[in-house]
């Protein structure tokens, strides 16, 4: 329901695309049970990201869970976070950039791994590194990072990544990132 449609090319993720709203969006929670586990976890990362950028209730609910199961109210709140941000900034002028949290580093991870790492896993890694940068540059409390890492450990998601490319190539990839 974000209206952003894109595809990858040799320069990176979502380099070609449009902003076009769908006529409708259907949410069928029962389909979540049919997803492979890694894709389900990718969705969990999207939810925790929404909690970190705009809804503390989602974040607190996610980090206190002891299972993968997420109640529908939290999913609905995650959808509402995205709808609110997109409705306020459809063409990604300013506020919508919040939804890119974790994506700058995440896109580097995806490209560097030749897309062998799922988008959600890459964003999870990206969030981790962007939190570390926020701690270093802005004084983000370590407790937020610890809570996030605890959650990633609970869902058995890796959060560290050893880049295969050298720093010059990574910088070149960053120059082509859509953001």
Region locations from a protein language model:
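A glycine/threonine-rich phosphate-anchoring loop and its flanking beta-alpha core
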Residues: 1-64
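Short acidic (Asp/Glu) and glycine-rich catalytic loops that position anionic groups and cofactors
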Residues: 24, 55-61, 105-109, 128-129, ...
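Short alpha-helical scaffolding segments that buttress acidic/His motifs in well-ordered protein cores
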Residues: 44-48, 74-82, 127, 152, ...
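C-terminal charged capping/lid subdomain of soluble metabolic enzymes
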Residues: 45-47, 139-179
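Structural signal for hydrophobic packing residues in well-ordered secondary-structure cores
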Residues: 48-55, 66, 82, 89, ...
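Oxyanion-binding "anion nests"
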Residues: 64-116
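Amphipathic alpha-helical interaction segments
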Residues: 73, 77, 100, 104, ...
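Internal helical hairpin/lid segments
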Residues: 100, 104-144
């Amino acid at each position: 329901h974000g209206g952003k449609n894109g595809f990858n090319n040799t320069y990176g993720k979502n380099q070609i695309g449009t902003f076009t709203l769908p006529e409708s969006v259907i949410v069928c929670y029962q389909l979540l049970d049919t997803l492979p586990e890694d894709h389900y976890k990718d969705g969990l990362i999207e939810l925790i990201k929404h909690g970190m950028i705009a809804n503390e209730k989602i974040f607190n609910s996610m980090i206190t869970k002891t299972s993968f199961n997420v109640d529908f109210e939290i999913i609905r709140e995650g959808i509402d976070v995205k709808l609110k941000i997109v409705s306020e900034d459809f063409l990604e002028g300013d506020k919508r950039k919040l939804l890119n949290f974790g994506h700058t580093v995440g896109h580097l991870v995806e490209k560097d791994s030749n897309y062998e790492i799922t988008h959600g896993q890459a964003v999870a890694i990206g969030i981790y590194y962007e939190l570390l940068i926020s701690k270093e540059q802005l004084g983000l409390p370590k407790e937020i990072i610890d809570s996030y890492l605890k959650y990633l450990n609970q869902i058995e998601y890796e959060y560290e990544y050893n880049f295969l490319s050298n720093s010059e190539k990574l910088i070149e990839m960053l120059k082509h990132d859509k953001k």
